[in-house]
Amino acid sequence: MRIINLFDMKLKDIISIVPLIKEQGFDAIQISPLQTTKDEEEFDWDKWWILYQPIDFNISNKRIGSSLELKKLCNFAHKYGLYIIADIVVGHMAGRDNGEVYPNSKIDKEFVDNKDNWRSFLYVDNWDDRYQVINRSMGLPGLNHNSVIVQDKIINMINNYIDLGVDGFRIDAAKSIGLEDEGCNFFNNITYNMKRNSNGELVKIVYGEVICSSNDLIDRYSKYMKVLTNYNYVGYNNNDAVIPFIEDKDNWYDPNINGLGWTNNLSTREIVRRYSNLTRIYDNTLFYPRISKDKCNEFEKAWLTDNIREANKVKIKR
């Protein structure tokens, strides 16, 4: 599956380019998170992180689009045989404006006041320590994924997405959510309680963000979903388990993030070349067309090149 990540593009604008996306050989479109965020009026490109600071589990975002627009996009994309994948933020909520790792005042007070909904507000200071990663907060107030209330809200949101026609999900920061062998039943319960789509089919496209991780950790998460990760952390033996990328929006927007910003130094042409190489090795790939830092919400045209179209046509022989 060849996925294009149209992060920060409005749903109505995506609708206008669906035919082109199909022509370029992509199979699926990953859209931005649609949960309500703490600052919905911030539209500058360098405020990209606001989309990952939700205050609820609703499906409507002033910056990206409404649930009605999402349904329209799904219906139109399906006519072209394209899947729509929703990016969902389920690891944390928005923090206070002063940077403290405590819930934002716009989050429902009853939800905030229930201490069982939250993990420790201590920061993760050792990313190689799994106990810290799944029990502490990553600079934002982390959710307790064993909480029945938290799970019910996330399951309800996922099923609302499915009702609107969404075909799959990217789970943001999945690496920070514990696994069954670590005492967390989150992924088991989420998978079990996903409803079927309008055709009576189970959702088949689910992948979690597990970047900068060992093959062992990738293998452990792949028991529950496919794993979205940066290509240089993947061994070839993981082909069916992973969805690798050369550059994602994090790397492009923030050169200092996770030590991955080195791709900022690569030309668009080099990004395309490396992506083309990925498609010769992996059945599933993700391509992020860089957004222009000079023209807000305008994407560079690399995804429209012949090289991308030819790369997406590659079928790997086993």
What are the language-model segments listed below?
Residues 1-11, 51-66, 95, 136-151, ...:
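The substrate-binding groove and active-site-proximal loops of carbohydrate-active enzymes
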Residues 1-83, 91, 101, 129-130, ...:
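N-terminal structural segment of carbohydrate-active enzymes
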Residues 16-22, 33-35, 40-52, 73-82, ...:
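Active-site-proximal helices and loops of the catalytic beta/alpha 8
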Residues 29-40, 115-124, 145-153, 267-268:
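Phosphate-binding glycine-rich loops and adjacent basic patches that engage nucleotide phosphates
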Residues 68, 94, 211:
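Short, flexible micro-motifs
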Residues 91-92, 126, 144, 230:
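Asparagine-centered polar/low-complexity signal
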Residues 101-138:
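Core domains of carbohydrate- and sulfate-ester-processing enzymes
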